[in-house]
Amino acid sequence: MKKLNLLLLTISLLCVIVSCNNTSDNKQFTLLSSTQTGVDFINELKENNTMNYFTYPYIYMGGGVSVGDINNDNLDDIFFTGNMAQNRLYLNKGNLVFDDITLSAGVGGNDKWYTGSTMVDINNDGYLDIYVSVAGLDGVKNNELLINNGCLLYTSDAADDSGC
C-alpha cells in the first residue's frame, strides 16, 4: 500500500511539474497606448521642499477614477480626479477609443486637491452626475456635485460643507 501511495504521489508531482511551463503567449490583457485610446490622463505628483509628505500629508491621497455611462449610449465613460493635474472626463466612442470632453463638459475643476469621485444619478433624471471629494490643509475643501444636464454639460449644483 505504501508503494502505491508513493507511486501516486510521484506521478502527481511529475504531472504538476510538466504542466508548469511559462511558454504560453496567451495574454488576457493587451496594453493600449494613449494614442490608440485617446486617454492621456497623468496625475504626476511633483515633490519638493514645500510639497512633500511631511509638509502636506494629503500628497499621496487622490487620483480617483469613476466609470459610468454619462450619455446613455451603453458605453462606459471615464472620469479621473487630479491632485496636481486637471480633472478629466473621457467620452467612450466605442472600440476602446475615447474623446476628452473635459473643457466642453465643464468638469476640469480648479486648484483644489481632488481625492476621489463617484457617479450617481442624484436627481433621478436618467443621467449620471459626478460627486467629487476634496481634501487638503488650506483653502476651501468643499466636495463638489456636478449635475449632468443631459447634453454632455455639467453644472456645479451643490457643495458639501463638511467643515473640515
Tell where the protein language model's regions lie, with residue ranges:
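Hydrophobic beta-strand segments that make up the repeating blades of beta-propeller
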Residues: 77-82, 130-135
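Bacterial N-terminal signal peptides that target proteins for export
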Residues: 1-8
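Beta-rich catalytic cores
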Residues: 61, 85, 113, 141
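Calcium-coordinating acidic loop motifs
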Residues: 69-71, 75, 93-94, 120-127, ...
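C-terminal motif of bacterial Sec signal peptides marking the signal peptidase cleavage site
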Residues: 18-19
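Beta-propeller blade repeat segments, especially FG-GAP/WD-type strand-to-loop junctions
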Residues: 29, 86-101, 140-153
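Conserved small/polar residues in nucleotide/adenosyl-binding loops
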Residues: 154-159
